[in-house]
Amino acid sequence: MKSVLLSPQAVRVIDYLNSVNHVPTIAEIGSAVGLSASTTWRILKSLRSQDIKFKAVTNLANLGLTEILLMYRTRLPIDRIPKKLLRSLIRTLEGVTLLRYVTKVHEVESSVNYVIAGIGVEPSEVYVLDTVIPPKYVSTHIARGSLDKIYLRELIAVASAPHPLGRSHSTGRVDPIDIALVNELEEDALIKIKDVYKSMKKVGGVPSYQTILKHYRVHILERGVIVGIRPTLEKFIEKHTAVTKKLLVMYGTPHSLSKGVRAVTAIPGFMEAYLNAKEGVAYTVASIPLGLIPKIVDFLG
């Protein structure tokens, strides 16, 4: 792999954004890493040009919603998959299809039946995803330009560190404005609300800017919907080394599962993980450099 070195300032910016569970302003980022707002803005612009962006990792439970995972051990045709409420679709080379849907907490059963009726096939497994774990990358993998190495001691330290549950948040009603905000933040965590307003305005029938801002502050921020910010490093990694996209499904006790997930998601290229602690299952997706695969297998073993 070609050596890829980011400046220490850029790594500090990435590191800070990866550590917070809210959307900071440019001035706040600069203050936290000891840079001026203008320098911080230039660094973010430079990172974007290198395909390093930032997305919000969201916990929809704080909006009164839940996510369900349906696993099919067959490759389903795209046209048979119901699109309403669909959050993500993953099809692996091994022939597994994973469908993730969002629904209201009290409508899980009816939503599962809706999907099954549309597809016409019973899934092999169904899970209600009750926990989202945002990845906390070990920045030395980026700083040293060494995405082809795993620093086990660092990964184990990340996994073993205490992770307080944090304060609980109230859930109230959810409406299309909230969902639109979540969709925009999951594409770009640093997007300005005025740009969200412009985007929604193109569709038509949009409330005022003040209404959208109120929803953002009261429904998104105060309810703790944003649980982390993830640098999107997949394209950056793919530019500089041969990678394979892998789906990782893990099973175990709640404690071992949480520890294992936090360890592997400290590796750049891994995305947020979704868990059902009661059932003891978790899954995440990653763009993994080919040289890392044997080491990850050994680490998980």
Where are these regions (language model features)?
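A compositional/biophysical signature of low hydrophobicity enriched in polar/charged and small residues
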Residues: 1-301
